Design a protein with these regions (language model features):
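Terminal edge beta-strands and adjacent linker/stalk segments
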Residues: 1-23, 141-161
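Extracellular beta-sheet repeat scaffolds used for adhesion and glycan interaction
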Residues: 8-9, 13, 39-40, 73-115, ...
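Short, solvent-exposed loop/edge segments of extracellular or virion-exposed proteins
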Residues: 31-40
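Short beta-strand elements of extracellular/lumenal beta-sandwich folds
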Residues: 47-62
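Short, hydrophobic/aromatic beta-strand segments
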Residues: 62-70
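Short glycine/proline/serine/threonine-rich loop/turn segments at secondary-structure transition edges
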Residues: 117-126
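Conserved small/polar residues in nucleotide/adenosyl-binding loops
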Residues: 162-169
Length: 172
């Protein structure tokens, strides 16, 4: 006897395979963190660089393709800001190239923004990243919006950085 699935009503009572179905689970998690490179004056504000690190982890059991990352950057008044650079692909911990994520793999993207006087005057900069990918046989069916890596702090969708107006700003 090689194997038997225990179902004698299927017509084969001696050698039939035991099948276990594994359902595909496409799932990603996007995390974004931010740090500020100060321009030397010791105050977060105009001229400082906000460095963003975006990680996308494939938490599912299938390889994902066509991975794209979009970024929305706004000031505290909701005015759209233009990212200085990025998000751009920095690498993946299992060696996949741009746009592909193996199960369990983490891809890293980076971006930065140089704080302008106008953005600093609003007091905050908000940044949200969204990743979208395709699972086998599907198109753009997997997505997630960034959190800051700590879902317990109530800040589950963006990174806020409070800024100070530039001392060079004569409008104060």
């Amino acid at each position: 006897d090689i194997s038997d699935d225990g179902d004698d009503t299927d017509g084969n009572t001696t050698d039939d395979s035991t099948d276990i179905d594994i359902d595909p689970v496409p799932l990603i998690e996007v995390t974004k963190t931010a740090s500020v490179t100060d321009d030397g004056n010791g105050i977060t504000g105009t001229g400082d660089v906000i460095n963003y690190v975006i990680t996308i982890e494939n938490k599912g059991n299938v390889t994902l393709s066509s991975l794209t990352v979009t970024d929305s950057l706004t000031d505290a008044n909701g005015v759209s800001l233009v990212m200085g650079n990025g998000p751009y692909f920095s690498g993946a911990n299992q060696g996949s190239g741009l746009g592909t994520l193996l199960p369990g793999e983490i891809a890293t993207y980076r971006a930065y923004f140089i704080i302008t006087d106008a953005a600093a005057l609003t007091g905050a900069i908000s940044n949200i990243a969204t990743a979208t990918a395709s699972s086998p046989g599907q198109t753009n069916n997997v997505s997630d919006t960034s959190d800051d890596g700590d879902d317990t702090d109530g800040n589950t969708t963006n990174c806020l950085l409070y800024t100070s107006p530039s001392p060079r700003d004569k409008r104060l």
